[in-house]
Amino acid sequence: MAKVAIDVDGVLADFTKAFIGAVNSIWPARLKPDFVPTDWDWTNSGLTHGEISKVWWKIKKTSNWWLGLDAYSDNVGALAMWMASRTDHDIWLCTSRAVVAGLTCAKQTDIWVQSCGLRPVNNFMGIITVTNGNKKSMVYEAAEIEWSIDDKWETVIDCGLIGSFEHKAYLLNQTWNKDASVYRRVNTLEDFLLKVDDGKANAGPVAVRHASGDRAAGVDQSARNLTAAHQGRVGETSERSRRP
């Protein structure tokens, strides 16, 4: 049996498409439908911090906004097939989402997951919501979750620093994390799930440093502090970041 944590937005759900829709609902045709951010903060979008704040304000006022996200069909399909053909695994869908009008984030996520046809079958599947991605590592450590996948490189590095047991954290390749020097990467959720089946992680540390600076990422406390400091700046508020 394995305990596995899977991020939702950027792994199962297409947040980018939904956020583009929110932008264009305020400023028609501001972003092309096929726009792809090249970093977490959407700096190539041309949106100012004030404009991003305005988009988030509208999202937060939209009832049950999280229910409207499209799924990454390949990843959702891979998870559905994996759960249908495996037994006795604990799968946690862990997401950091801003609070919006309507149902709670957890309930919206639960309804969305069911609408995608995801069923645990002979496994257990639960939902965990956190207010910020930098809290995921604490949750995983407390629950002794052994495997995780995320599209945010800081979260993957932080989870890789869990010291009380061997946690195997992987980064799902996306355009907004391509410059992060994270060794444990996969191209698809299916690739990650096959690693869970194998039971072995890639050798070596999760990462060494981020390409844009000297934030070391190894196994010492200074790395954890540096990662937390970065998350405090970038992930502290939805208005500064693409996502919490």
Positions of predicted regions on the chain:
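Substrate-recognition element of Asp-dependent hydrolases with the DxDx(T/V) motif
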Residues: 66-71, 75-109, 113, 130
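Non-catalytic pre-domain segments flanking phosphatase-related domains
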Residues: 1-6, 19, 25, 209-213, ...
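Short catalytic/ligand-binding loop motif for oxyanion handling, primarily in non-cytosolic enzymes
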Residues: 13-16, 20-21, 91, 100-104, ...
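Active-site neighborhood of HAD-like aspartate-dependent phosphohydrolases
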Residues: 1-57
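Short acidic-hydrophobic, aromatic-tinged amphipathic segments that line or gate anion-handling sites
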Residues: 127-132, 183-192
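Acidic, Mg2+-coordinating phosphoryl-transfer loop and its flanking beta/alpha structural elements
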Residues: 145-189, 212
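Internal alpha/beta domain cores that form substrate/cofactor-binding pockets in large enzymes
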Residues: 92, 127-129, 159-176, 193-208
